[in-house]
């Protein structure tokens, strides 16, 4: 096994099937790399990341659980976000939501 390798039951595994997805352009305006984990409320990420935060409310990265996206200083990239599932209640992170989405 290779570290980080995923074993699936078929040739292709679809992450988060049936959830609303949204694509956003994100730019790192800081002088340091910024990494965002798979389940972090994307609207509450580091303030040095430039993107439409209102469009990202209630969403997280559409990547495998436990993985992350890293943006180097000045880097712009496109990310795909998906809605949080379950009760859609968010606490913590940067403290901007603190309750129901």
Swiss-Prot record:
The keyword Chaperone does not apply. InterPro entries: Urease_beta-like, Urease_betasu_sf, Urease_subunit. It is an enzyme of class 3 (hydrolase). It is found in: Cytoplasm. Keywords: Cytoplasm, Hydrolase. Belongs to the urease beta subunit family. Heterotrimer of UreA (gamma), UreB (beta) and UreC (alpha) subunits. Three heterotrimers associate to form the active enzyme. This is Urease subunit beta. It comes from Albidiferax ferrireducens (strain ATCC BAA-621 / DSM 15236 / T118) (Rhodoferax ferrireducens).
């Amino acid at each position: 096994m290779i570290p980080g390798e995923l074993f699936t039951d078929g040739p292709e595994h679809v992450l988060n099937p049936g959830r609303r997805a949204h694509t956003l352009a994100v730019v790192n305006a800081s002088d340091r790399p910024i990494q965002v984990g798979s389940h972090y409320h994307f609207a509450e990420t580091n303030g040095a990341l430039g993107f439409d935060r209102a469009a990202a409310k209630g969403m997280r990265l559409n990547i495998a659980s436990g993985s992350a996206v890293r943006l180097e200083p000045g880097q712009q990239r496109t990310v795909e976000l998906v809605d949080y599932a379950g009760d859609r209640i968010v606490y913590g992170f940067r403290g901007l939501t603190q309750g129901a989405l």
